[in-house]
Structures are given as C-alpha cells and as structure tokens.
Amino acid sequence: ISIGYLLVKHSQTDQEPMCPVGMNKLWSGYSLLYFEGQEKAHNQDLGLAGSCLARFSTMPFLYCNPGDVCYYASRNDKSYWLSTTAPLPMMPVAEEDIRPYISRCSVCEAPAVAIAVHSQDVSIPHCPAGWRSLWIGYSFLMHTAAGDEGGGQSLVSPGSCLEDFRATPFIECNGARGTCHYYANKYSFWLTTIPEQSFQGTPSADTLKAGLIRTHISRCQVCMKNL
C-alpha cells in the first residue's frame, strides 16, 4: 500500500539502510542533523525527509546579502551530521577520509504515519494496540555544539528514537576548511530512566561512566498503525 507518507531511516553506519518490508525507497543520502550559519543553528528533525540529503558536502549552503552578492565557504559556518561507529580520529579528517564517519539514510514511502513511544525505563515500550513495530532504540532528545547552539527532536518523531546509543552521536564539519572532527564542546541529551513512581520531585545527582550509561537511558520504539 502506498499512500505517500514518508519514513526516514538512519543507519548510523556508512551503509545505506533498508526500508521496512513492503515500503519503497524514494531516495538515499546522508544524515543531516543541523546547520550553523552566522553563529545561529537551524535544526533538522531526523524523522523528516529533509534530514536525508542526497549529496554530502562539509558546506552544503551559501549565504547572500542585500547587495545581491552571495558567498560560499568563505567563513566559519558549519554542518553537523549523524556519525558512525568508526574509530575516533586523532585529527580532523578531510576529502574521502570523511566518508566512513557520516551516517547514511533512506527515505521510504510508508502506508501510515509512524510515531515514537518512549518508556522512560530500560525496558522496550509496547506499541499501542493496533500498531506494529518498525524498530527499537534509545530516546534522543537534543544536542548542542559550538557557541551553545544546537537543536532537538520532537519526542513523537521517529527521529527521537536512534537505534544505536553513543555519547557522541554526531560529527562537526567546518565548511571553509573542508574538514570534520569530534570536538570536546559537543553534547548529546537523552531521556533518562525514571523510577516507577510516575512523579519524581528532586532527582539524585549522579555521574555515569562507560558501561553504566545505558542503564540510565530511556528506551523507545517506533510504531506504525496497521491498516
């Protein structure tokens, strides 16, 4: 059944993801998280087709002024992309060395709208009655980077349910230099687990190291209504 709804899948690897069974692939591309220009961020919802650009560039946009003059790759604007599990580079990467670090994506034609459901627990939430599962993941909330700019995901969007958790799920690319790197000023924010009591007043401060982090990250499931 093809009705024209769009579903976006991000592989978080350098391989194009497959569309769910019965869905046609409309195009594939690279997983764009957000742009930064004039020190202001413009976010992309990872659940919408605009987050899957068919072609990759460290600087996929230019800017124009009121004097009818436009400039490309001439200042410190940036682009941010979902990344892969490739080993962290010691230095910024350029040219073809960038490719292994950029997540691939596919835009699929779906028969119904897909939603994300979050458990706020380490258990996988159930889809509503009459809905089926498309994938399970971790509840991705928001992100910040250079200049405290960033963005976030609507928690009903499939883009808020990433199949793979990592503390640094995206990479920064500098348009003028044509390089990409994981810088120390990038932060990711995730829904956390909440005790079974549905109302929590004062949380207890905690610091989580590798190996324990996933025990405090909310799980999610992307669901689609059965037709």
From Swiss-Prot:
Disulfide bridge partners, by residue number: C19-C108, C52-C105, C64-C70, C127-C223, C161-C220, C173-C180
The record ties this protein, via InterPro entries, to: Collagen_IV_NC, Collagen_IV_NC_sf, CTDL_fold, NDNF
A Pfam family assignment: C4
Database matches in PROSITE patterns? NC1_IV (PS51403)
The entry's keywords: Basement membrane, Collagen, Disulfide bond, Extracellular matrix, Hydroxylation, Repeat, Secreted
* Collagen IV NC1 domain boundaries: 4-227
| Intracellular or extracellular location(s) | Secreted, Extracellular space, Extracellular matrix, Basement membrane
SUPFAM superfamilies the UniProt entry points to: C-type lectin-like
Cellular component, GO annotation: basement membrane; collagen trimer; extracellular region
Q: What is stated as this protein's family in its record?
A: Belongs to the type IV collagen family.
Q: How does it assemble?
A: There are six type IV collagen isoforms, alpha 1(IV)-alpha 6(IV), each of which can form a triple helix structure with 2 other chains to generate type IV collagen network. Interacts with EFEMP2.
Q: What is the purpose of this protein?
A: Type IV collagen is the major structural component of glomerular basement membranes (GBM), forming a 'chicken-wire' meshwork together with laminins, proteoglycans and entactin/nidogen. Potently inhibits angiogenesis and tumor growth.
About its domains, the entry says:
Alpha chains of type IV collagen have a non-collagenous domain (NC1) at their C-terminus, frequent interruptions of the G-X-Y repeats in the long central triple-helical domain (which may cause flexibility in the triple helix), and a short N-terminal triple-helical 7S domain.
**PANTHER family linked:** COLLAGEN TYPE IV ALPHA 4 CHAIN, NEURON-DERIVED NEUROTROPHIC FACTOR
What is the name of this protein?
Answer: Collagen alpha-2(IV) chain
Origin species? Bos taurus
Q: Which gene encodes it?
A: COL4A2
